[in-house]
């Protein structure tokens, strides 16, 4: 009985972790993705709320290459209540090859989640629409702290069409 229970728990754990690195239904990662052009600083413009970003302003992400072929992810946000910056460092690896905007990302040991780029300004990589493993994760990232109205409108329209709850978007303040 103990072996059966242990086996079940192992299968359940693998299934749960596998689900954390999936793609939401209806979402397609961008193709012809260029990791080199994606590197550098990004500003978080809008998002759906999650505990790890709750109450933060001035949120940025920096992507750089790792020696093992992955990307280093450095997220920062300012916690005004505590008067301090919160920083999280992670790593990301391509899930469908280097030319698709779909990565597994980890900020904690062997546990990975999804990072799915479903729209991207392919001319100059000026903005990026990103989700996670399910539709409770949604971000609009930009190379600048503000985006033109047409980019924000495109983001909201596309996210709505894909089934994201854009009424719950939080717009990030940048100084």
Describe every region a protein language model picked out:
Residues 1-9:
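Bacterial N-terminal signal peptides that target proteins for export
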Residues 2, 19-175:
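A beta-rich soluble binding module of mature secreted/lumenal proteins
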Residues 14-17:
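Bacterial Sec-type N-terminal signal peptides, specifically the leucine/valine-rich hydrophobic h-region
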């Amino acid at each position: 009985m103990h072996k059966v229970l242990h086996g079940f728990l192992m299968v359940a754990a693998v299934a749960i972790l596998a689900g954390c690195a999936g793609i939401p239904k209806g979402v397609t990662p961008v193709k012809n993705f260029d990791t080199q052009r994606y590197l550098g600083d990004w500003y978080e413009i809008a998002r759906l709320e999650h505990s790890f970003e709750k109450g933060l302003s001035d949120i940025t992400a920096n992507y750089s290459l790792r020696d093992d072929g992955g990307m280093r992810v450095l997220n920062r946000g300012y916690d005004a209540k505590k008067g301090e910056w919160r920083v999280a460092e992670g790593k990301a690896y391509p899930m469908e090859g280097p030319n698709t905007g779909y990565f597994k990302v980890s900020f904690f040991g062997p546990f990975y989640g999804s990072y799915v780029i479903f729209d991207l300004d392919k001319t100059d990589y000026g903005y990026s629409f990103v989700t996670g493993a399910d539709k409770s994760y949604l971000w609009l990232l930009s190379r600048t702290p503000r985006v033109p109205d047409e980019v924000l409108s495109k983001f909201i329209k596309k996210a709505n069409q894909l089934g994201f709850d854009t009424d719950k978007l939080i717009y990030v303040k940048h100084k």
